[in-house]
C-alpha cells in the first residue's frame, strides 16, 4: 500500500486569475458560468465548458439560467462529440469575411501583407510561469487557437474583443485534425489577423510546433515562436529536482511515450537510454510505462533507481508518486494517476526534498498543492 503524505505548500504566491469577467461577450454564452469554472483543463467536463465558452455568437444571447442542469459526467463525451466545433464553421466564415474587408479598407495602394502567427508556449500549468512576451502577445491577438493543456487561468488573459477557438486533442477524440489546424492558421493569417497558437509547455518540445511552423513558412507566412517552460523544467523545479547534478547526472534525455507508429511497446527506448548517469524524462508515457520500466531494467538500469510521476504538475491539482523503478508502474496504477502525467527517472529524483518522506520499502503519494 502506498504511503500517503500531505505536504503543505504555501499558495500565497499563486495569483488569483479567476475573477469573474462578465464583459467577455465575444467569448462567452450558452451554458458557461465563469463564477463556477475550475482552473483545471484536464477533465471532459471542462472540455464541455470550453466548448460552450468558445461559441462565437454575433448576436445578443441571454445566458442560460443557473438552474439549467449541465450534462452529467457520463454524458460529457457524447455531448462534446455531438457539438463538435464544426458547428462554428459558419461563424468562422463570417469572421474571415470581416477581417478581409477590414484589411482591404486599411490597405494603402492595395498592397497588404499577411498577418503574423505566433506559436506561444504557456508552460506546464501555473499561469505565473508565463513569460512577459507571451502575456503581451496573448493580449494583442485577434484569434487564438488553443490546446487541451492550456489552462483557463491563461485564457483569462485574452483581450475582450479577441476570438478563441479550441482545437485540443484527447485520446480517441480530436476536435480538429492537424491538417485542419494548419489551414485555420493559414486562412486567418492570409486575412491579415494576428493569430496566436497556444500550446502547453514549450511549442517545440513534443508540441508539433515544428510542423505548424514548417507548413506556414512554406506558405510565406511569418511565424514567431515564443518559448514556454517545458513540463520537464517546470515540474522538476516544483519538486526540487535538478535534472542534471554534478557527480549524479551528466545529461538529461526527453522521451515521448507516444510513437507515430502506434502500438504499446516503447520503441523509442534504446540500449543507451539505460545509462545510470542520465536523467530520463518521459512525456505522455503512462500507457507505455510498464514496458518502458522493464526494458530499462533489462538493459541494466538498477531496479532501485528513483523515479517520480507527476500528474497535472504546477497546478492546484498536482499529485506526485515517488517509487523505485521496480515498483513504479504498479504504484502509479494504484494511485490512479491520469493524463497529463510527466515521468522522471534517475538518481537526481533522490535529491528532491520530498524523497526522504518515502521509505525504502514503500512508494510515496504526495499531494503537494
Curated annotation (Swiss-Prot):
Cellular component terms (Gene Ontology): chloroplast
Pathway in which the depicted protein is active: Porphyrin-containing compound metabolism; siroheme biosynthesis; precorrin-2 from uroporphyrinogen III: step 1/1
Localization terms from the record: Plastid, Chloroplast
GO biological process, one term: positive regulation of chlorophyll biosynthetic process
Keyword S-adenosyl-L-methionine: yes
Family: Belongs to the precorrin methyltransferase family.
Protein name: S-adenosyl-L-methionine-dependent uroporphyrinogen III methyltransferase, chloroplastic
Lineage, highest ranks first: Eukaryota, Viridiplantae, Streptophyta, Embryophyta, Tracheophyta
Amino acid at each position: 500500500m502506498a504511503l500517503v503524505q500531505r505536504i503543505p505548500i504555501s499558495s500565497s504566491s499563486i495569483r488569483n486569475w479567476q475573477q469573474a469577467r462578465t464583459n467577455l461577450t465575444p467569448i462567452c454564452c450558452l451554458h458557461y458560468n465563469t463564477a463556477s469554472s475550475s482552473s483545471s483543463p484536464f477533465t471532459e467536463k471542462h472540455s464541455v465548458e470550453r466548448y460552450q465558452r468558445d461559441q462565437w455568437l454575433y448576436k445578443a444571447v441571454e445566458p442560460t439560467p443557473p438552474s439549467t442542469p449541465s450534462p452529467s459526467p457520463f454524458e460529457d463525451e457524447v455531448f462534446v462529440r455531438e457539438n463538435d466545433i464544426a458547428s462554428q464553421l459558419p461563424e468562422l466564415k463570417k469572421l474571415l469575411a470581416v477581417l478581409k474587408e477590414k484589411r482591404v479598407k486599411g490597405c494603402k495602394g492595395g498592397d497588404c501583407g499577411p498577418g503574423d502567427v505566433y506559436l506561444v508556449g504557456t508552460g506546464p500549468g501555473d499561469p505565473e510561469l508565463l513569460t512577459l512576451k507571451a502575456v503581451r502577445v496573448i493580449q494583442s491577438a485577434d484569434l487564438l487557437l488553443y490546446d487541451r493543456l492550456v489552462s483557463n487561468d491563461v485564457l483569462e488573459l485574452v483581450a475582450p474583443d479577441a476570438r478563441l477557438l479550441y482545437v485540443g486533442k484527447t485520446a480517441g477524440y480530436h476536435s480538429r485534425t492537424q491538417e485542419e489546424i494548419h489551414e485555420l492558421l493559414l486562412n486567418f493569417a492570409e486575412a491579415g489577423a494576428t493569430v496566436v497558437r497556444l500550446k502547453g509547455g514549450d511549442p517545440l518540445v513534443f508540441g508539433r510546433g515544428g510542423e505548424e511552423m514548417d507548413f506556414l513558412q512554406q506558405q510565406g507566412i511569418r511565424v514567431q515562436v515564443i518559448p514556454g517552460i517545458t513540463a520537464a523544467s517546470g515540474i522538476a523545479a516544483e519538486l526540487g529536482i535538478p535534472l542534471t547534478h554534478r557527480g549524479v547526472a551528466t545529461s538529461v534525455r526527453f522521451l515521448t511515450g507516444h510513437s507515430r507508429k502506434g502500438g504499446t511497446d516503447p520503441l523509442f527506448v534504446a540500449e543507451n537510454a539505460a545509462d545510470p548517469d542520465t536523467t530520463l524524462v518521459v512525456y505522455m508515457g503512462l500507457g507505455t510505462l510498464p514496458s518502458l520500466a522493464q526494458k530499462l531494467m533489462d538493459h541494466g538500469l538498477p531496479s532501485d533507481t528513483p523515479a517520480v510521476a507527476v500528474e497535472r504538475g504546477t497546478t492546484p491539482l498536482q499529485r506526485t508518486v515517488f517509487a523505485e523503478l521496480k515498483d513504479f508502474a504498479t504504484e502509479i496504477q494504484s494511485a490512479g494517476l491520469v493524463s497529463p502525467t510527466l515521468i522522471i527517472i534517475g538518481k537526481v529524483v533522490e535529491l528532491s526534498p520530498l524523497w526522504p518522506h518515502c521509505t525504502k520499502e514503500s512508494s510515496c503519494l504526495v499531494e503537494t498543492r
